[in-house]
A protein has these predicted regions:
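Extreme N-terminal starter segment of soluble prokaryotic enzymes
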Residues: 1-4
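Adenine-nucleotide phosphate-binding core of ATP-dependent small-molecule kinases
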Residues: 264, 271-275, 282-317
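Glycine-rich phosphate-binding loop of actin/hexokinase-like ATP-binding domains
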Residues: 151-254
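Internal helix-turn-beta structural module
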Residues: 297, 301-322, 331-395
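Short glycine-rich, Thr/Ser-proximal phosphate-binding strand/loop in the N-terminal lobe
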Residues: 12-57, 227
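Phosphate/pyrophosphate-binding loops at sites that engage ATP/ADP/AMP, CoA/4′-phosphopantetheine
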Residues: 70-85, 191-196, 311-322
Length: 395
């Protein structure tokens, strides 16, 4: 079985073709600047040279067809015909309260995706366009929607609810959903396998430019740091994370700006960028801190402290923890971040093997000592494989 995994953004389309027999990537690539000048497809077949196509892509339909052409190209392709593709798995951001698992795409499913445009205004419209483009390009092929919110949909209601009038939950489905769900599902599941303990209590720290933490027992989510939107939770590259809601009114009144403008500030001008004034990139802020920039150092300290605080909170929520797993761009590649966070966790019996922590090279690595009461792990996320697995289950 071969599964084509699609992740459609407003002007981009990322893809991987995965052979599920051995879970190997046959090819991957990205279409960029869809609907704009300078559209380009970068296609990388495994074991072959990269293939770049500069061609107008006025819409996602054209992009999907170019992807199929590249996959079947005589020199750079990996399949003889699109008939070899069994199904298409799509990353879809939001399903509201309707779906807590991956699902075969039907007209009803597309309506749910459409109805959630206001909950995922940047992603859901593009996700739906990608689904419909694939339906048109490959009629009759099953499409599967794998929702980013699905993993967090099953958290206990006490963890999901905001303490606001209940009618807002009933009327608008306002609750905590969580995001990065496909990554958390994959990493927590792989951690459970690694531990060999079916009911393992796992905290996953997905730390990239966007960042979130989840708590799970036996691979089932019990809490997660992002909320109705990805703005809640950790300090991120440009997002504030947790903030007193009254701050919005205070700044709006004093700066004479609208709520929408204030939300834009919290989403795009806050986080590491907001505190440091240097950059939203962890590496740039870390370097500025090392060079003596006090605001950059404060940004780094706040960033790490928030992670450690959530780990403590989730340890309490699960009445213990067996493993803490770091993943995503920063989590996988910043040994100093991992060390500084683990320095907060001595009360849990966490002991880091500093040599192992400094020598992680893109593979799953246990970086705690054998004596550590909690395993600390670095585990590369693989959202595409997770989507392919969910797709394969349904077709």
């Amino acid at each position: 079985m071969k599964v084509l995994v699609m992740n459609c953004g407003s002007s981009s389309l990322k893809y991987q073709l995965i052979d599920m027999e051995n879970e190997s990537v046959l090819a991957k690539g990205i279409c960029e600047r869809i609907g704009a000048d300078g559209s380009v497809l970068t296609h990388k077949p495994t074991g072959k040279d990269k293939y770049v196509v500069e061609q107008a892509m006025p819409d996602h339909g054209v992009a999907v067809q170019l992807v199929l052409d590249a996959l079947q190209d005589k020199e750079h392709g990996v399949i003889e015909s699109a008939d070899e593709i069994t199904a298409i798995g799509h990353r879809v951001l939001h399903a509201g309260t309707i779906y807590s698992d991956a699902t075969l795409v039907t007209e009803d499913v597309k309506k749910v995706v459409r109805d959630c445009f206001d909950l995922g205004p940047l992603h859901n419209p593009a996700n739906l366009i990608g689904i419909e483009a694939c339906e048109k390009a490959m009629p009759g092929k099953p499409n599967v929607a794998v929702f980013d919110t699905a993993f967090g949909m099953n958290i206990p209601k006490k963890a999901a609810m905001y303490a606001i009038p209940y009618e807002y939950y009933e009327r608008y489905s306002i609750r905590r959903y969580g995001f990065h769900g496909t990554s958390h599902m994959f990493v927590s599941g792989e951690t459970v396998k690694l531990l060999g303990k079916e009911d393992a209590k796992v905290i996953v720290c997905h730390i990239g430019n966007g960042a979130s933490i989840s708590a799970s027992i036996g691979g089932k989510c019990v809490d997660t740091s992002m909320g109705l939107t990805p703005l809640e939770g950790l300090v991120m590259g440009t997002r504030s994370g947790d903030v007193d809601p009254a701050v919005l009114q205070f700044i709006c009144n004093h700066e004479d700006i609208s709520v929408d403008e204030m939300l834009n500030i919290l989403n795009k001008k806050s986080g590491l960028l907001g505190i440091s004034g240097v950059s939203s990139d962890f590496r740039d802020v870390r370097q500025a801190a090392a060079d003596g920039n006090e605001r950059a150092q404060l940004a780094m300290d706040t960033y790490k402290y928030r992670v450690a605080k959530y780990i403590g909170s989730y340890t309490a929520a699960m009445n213990g923890v067996d493993a803490i797993t770091f993943t995503a761009g920063v989590g996988e590649n910043a040994p100093d971040l991992r060390k500084d966070i683990c320095d907060y966790l001595g009360y849990l019996g966490v002991e880091l093997d500093e040599e192992k922590n400094e020598n992680v090279h893109g593979e799953t690595t246990v970086i705690s000592t054998p004596e550590s009461k909690v395993k600390v792990i670095v585990l590369p996320t693989n959202e595409e494989l997770a989507i392919a697995r969910e797709t394969a289950k349904l077709v």
